[in-house]
Amino acid sequence: MPSRLSPPDIPPLQPTPTVSDGHHRFQTLPLIIAGSLTLTGVLLILVTLLIYRRLYRNRTAPSDLISNSKSPQHYQCRRFSYSQLRRATNSFSESTHLGHGGFGSVYKADFPSGGDSLAVKVMDTSAGSLQGEREFHNELSLSSHLIGSPHVVSLLGFSSDRRGRKLILVYELMANRSLQDALLDRKCVELMDWNKRFEIATDIAKGIEFLHHCCDPIIIHGDIKPSNILLDSDFKAKIGDFGLARVKSEDFDTRILIEEEDKSKDVVEDNGSILEETESVITVFEEGNNVVNLSPETCGISVLTETVASPGEKSGLSPENCAVSILTVEVGAASPAMASIPSPETCAISVLTDTGLSPESSKLKVGSKRDWWWKQDNNGGSRGGIESGSVKDYVMEWIGSEIKKERPSNNKEWINNGDGSSSVSKKKKKEKKRKPREWWKEEFCEELTRKKRKKKKKKKRGLSSISSIDSWFHRDDGASSVHDHNLNPTKRKKRNSIDWWVDGLSGELKSVMGKKNSQDSGLWCDVNVQKSGGVSSTPSMRGTVCYIAPECGGGGVLSEKCDVYSFGVLLLVLVSGRRPLQVTASPMSEFERANLISWAKQLACNGKLLELVDKSIHSLEKEQAVLCITIALLCLQRSPVKRPTMKEIVEMLSGVSEPPHLPFEFSPSPPMGFPFKSRKKAR
């Protein structure tokens, strides 16, 4: 039987793809793309939030604090969370409120975990002002320099609330609050002990000494006052509130302080001012060359001729025969013939003439900084030396015209003996001085009448007592002196007994009034004389009224001597237990003591310093009290150069150095050799 071949295996047929499967794949592709895009967007949002959070933290904390956060000096200054501080202060309730500063409120924060209590200062930034934020950053930047002193309040941390723009600083808690609250408001019994007050004064001095002599760079506090002096549980004083403090730069020197000294000198600005004041040429005869060269401050201008011919010869003097020189004059001349040369106060133009000088020997001697007008169009010239060459024709013509105006018709009358010429020069000098004085007096009287009219208008409008105090500050010293001169002696004496205390405050702030008259109206309107007599800080100036030094008022440059001045006022407040300006409805005797600084100066002149001491103090050490008042008066001197340094003050208080003496102007018995020369001429 024939075999059958098996049929070959046929692979199964693949089903053809249908239209429904392709449509399903087309639907899943957009879902995958949408999911990936959503995930990418979420990741971008998270990264953006992280970057924003980092940038916000960098804006809250200063850059130098962040960059140096790894240094051991910054380990104490930590960042607190806002929620943690809010729980510790019971949501900043009134029960934990300790006080209110210039730009923030202070609360007590209790931490249950550590058991410690801290002080939390919430900076006020809701008013739209950046001052609170500036103080916040300023204190953070200075925190690294203030570590290591027991006399400075330590900054422990900071925090910020992004939503409410709350900037918070965390300090160590000072149980007895500020010196102003303990001494002037609550009048703590512990401060009635003199030893405790003296210890507080020493602690404050050591704290300022740490800022000036131990910190590198030097820190200037700028706002030393009782409200910024904090007391711990043992009444140990510490300096706080460094919101207005500044770091002294390396290139800062005392040139500004020296300029204050130079302002008191009588310096001739230019030749034009000399001509306007004198309006005369004084002729003086001299037989020798007794010309004394002194400092440039005592410069006068003279036309000088040397004696060549014999005294018996008589010859005409022409302007071309005169040599021009810058002549320096001393008040006490070297020879009797120089006695008639005008003093620097008169700044006259002297013509010292004689015969026999040729025009070729004319020389221009430049010896002063104020010789610019001699060197016009003369290519600068050689400063400080003798300059050869011809002098400009218009200069010689001017000199000749001035000499011809005053030359007598007869030469015999002009060339006379020395005594006669000196007497003639004195008479001319007096006569020529009358016109400027009369002109000045007329203008001054007009100004006085204008002021009287303004005062009458103010009285009619019924201004408040604050505006009357403001008028005391704006009172002109010259006007008051002329008005007092017109009064009889009895009325003038009664008036001085009431107004002397105002002179101290207005005198200390006179430099501020002179520098910025246009801005001072707004500045002085900010001075709030409260019922308690306290004076508040003003945002337009650095410091506090009555505590700020006169040279740094109106936005001036701060220096260590500004803190010294403020310490002097603070020392008087601590000794007397009174505010620097305390106006109350008391008898007239108390009203005269309203200005503490003027009262202290008056008592020093009368030799009654102990009357300044607080009557409620017991166990008083009189020597220490006199020492404190003397140091305070040394600190309150107008010239910053004359004030002592804080290192010297600490040595005085600790007894290392000898007790200081009162300043000369406050001494009750001035010595015989009075340095100021009387302006009255001997007859």
Curated annotation (Swiss-Prot):
Residues at the catalytic site: 223 (proton acceptor)
Domain Protein kinase, first and last residues per copy: 92-664
Primary localization: membrane
Reaction(s) catalysed (UniProt annotation): L-seryl-[protein] + ATP = O-phospho-L-seryl-[protein] + ADP + H(+); L-threonyl-[protein] + ATP = O-phospho-L-threonyl-[protein] + ADP + H(+)
GO function term, MF aspect, one: ATP binding
Top-level taxonomic group: Eukaryota
Extracellular side: 1-30
The keyword ATP-binding is assigned to this record: yes
Composition bias type Basic residues, residue spans: 425-436
Region described as Disordered: 1-21, 406-436
Disulfide-bonded cysteines: none
Pfam families, sorted: Pkinase
InterPro entries to which the protein is assigned, alphabetical: At4g25390-like, Kinase-like_dom_sf, Prot_kinase_dom, Protein_kinase_ATP_BS, Ser/Thr_kinase_AS
Residues annotated as signal peptide: none
Its membrane topology: Single-pass membrane protein
GO CC terms of this entry: plasma membrane
Residues the record lists as binding ATP: 98-106, 121
Compositional bias per record (Polar residues), positions renumbered to this chain: 411-424
Keywords: ATP-binding, Cell membrane, Kinase, Membrane, Nucleotide-binding, Receptor, Serine/threonine-protein kinase, Transferase, Transmembrane, Transmembrane helix
Cytoplasmic topological domain: 52-683
Transmembrane segments: 31-51
UniProt protein name: Receptor-like serine/threonine-protein kinase At2g45590
Organism of derivation: Arabidopsis thaliana (Mouse-ear cress)
Origin organism lineage: Eukaryota, Viridiplantae, Streptophyta, Embryophyta, Tracheophyta
